């Protein structure tokens, strides 16, 4: 996804000190941020000009102690054509030399009122989400009791219909048919809909329905962490399915592994209720409550007592 300086300004409500239309459309290519400490001393080895340059209180304080000539020289060396923007935090005063260097080198110069740490975190969070490599997967992503559940299965098995039933039961639709997933970090997977499919569900025999229009804003969500994958498959006599819940299957998306549960589907089975139970049970396991382990302990104790009675 393309992220421009203009989008960043609108998202974080940044003040424009200097920028023209061309600079506002400059693309940001990395979520990494540079705090130019050593660079202010004139040390530019390993300098990364393609990063957003963020000036906080320390950088600003050092800069104001420099002579006007040295300040201008260092800033001219720091501001490169590849640099998307320079941002000053805490609403700090901006020296004339910084404005002059930005104008001459063609760099957007911006300012924010919030603290440097909060600003750095907000920039990274926003850019990480938009610049992460995305992978499209087929399925329905639902928010069930606050847990992101990706429902997959063969075509025609009833994924969208199950999603609709879950919406009617008070849960929220994130994406149907095509789910764009991306890794926010090594262990966290997020999913969102394709823009053209946002809030839409396709139901065979009915057509495309707008979930937000029919069920309200509380029935949809723009994105969600993917914490559990559920695979629906046709029930076949003789096929072995996990009945105790002590199996541990995972599926990998965008380099992140997600636990997966296989649920057999057959006529008369209320799949949406089963998925609700699976989501709640998964959350209970994360909190340390494992019904399978409890059952095994009870069974072991019962066997031990029976052995003692012999």
Swiss-Prot record:
Residues 201-210 are annotated as: Important for the catalytic mechanism of both phosphorylation and dephosphorylation. GO terms for biological process: regulation of carbohydrate metabolic process. Residues 264-269 are annotated as: Important for the catalytic mechanism of dephosphorylation. Pfam families: Hpr_kinase_C, Hpr_kinase_N. Its EC number is 2.7.11.-, 2.7.4.-. Keywords: ATP-binding, Carbohydrate metabolism, Kinase, Magnesium, Metal-binding, Multifunctional enzyme, Nucleotide-binding, Serine/threonine-protein kinase, Transferase. This is HPr kinase/phosphorylase. The lineage of its organism: Bacteria, Bacillati, Bacillota, Bacilli, Lactobacillales. The gene is hprK.
């Amino acid at each position: 996804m393309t992220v421009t300086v203009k989008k960043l300004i609108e998202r974080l409500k940044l003040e424009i000190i200097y920028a023209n239309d061309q600079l506002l459309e400059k693309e940001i290519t990395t979520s990494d941020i540079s705090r130019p400490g050593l660079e202010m001393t004139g040390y530019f080895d390993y300098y990364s000009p393609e990063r957003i340059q963020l000036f906080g209180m320390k950088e600003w304080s050092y800069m104001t102690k420099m002579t006007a000539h040295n300040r201008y020289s260092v800033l001219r060396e720091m501001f490169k054509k590849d640099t998307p923007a320079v941002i000053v935090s805490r609403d700090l005063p901006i020296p004339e030399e910084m404005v002059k260097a930005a104008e001459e080198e063609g760099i957007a110069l911006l300012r924010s009122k919030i603290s440097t740490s909060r600003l750095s975190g907000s920039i990274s969070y926003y850019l990480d989400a938009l610049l992460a490599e995305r992978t499209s997967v087929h399925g329905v992503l639902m928010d069930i009791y606050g847990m992101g559940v990706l429902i997959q299965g063969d075509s025609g098995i009833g994924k969208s219909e199950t999603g609709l039933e879950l919406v009617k039961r008070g849960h929220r639709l994130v994406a149907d048919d095509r789910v764009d997933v991306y890794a926010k970090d090594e262990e966290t997977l997020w999913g969102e809909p394709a823009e053209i499919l946002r809030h839409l569900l396709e139901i065979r025999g009915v057509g495309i329905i707008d979930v937000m229009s029919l069920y309200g804003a509380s029935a949809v969500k723009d994105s969600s962490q993917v914490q559990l994958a559920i695979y629906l498959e046709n029930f076949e006599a003789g096929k072995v399915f996990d009945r105790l819940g002590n199996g541990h299957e995972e599926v990998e998306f965008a380099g992140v592994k997600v636990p997966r549960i296989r649920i057999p589907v057959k006529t008369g089975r209320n799949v949406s209720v089963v998925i609700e139970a699976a989501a709640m049970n998964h959350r209970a396991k994360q909190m340390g409550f494992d019904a399978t382990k409890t059952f095994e302990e009870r069974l072991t104790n019962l066997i031990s007592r029976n052995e003692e009675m012999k």
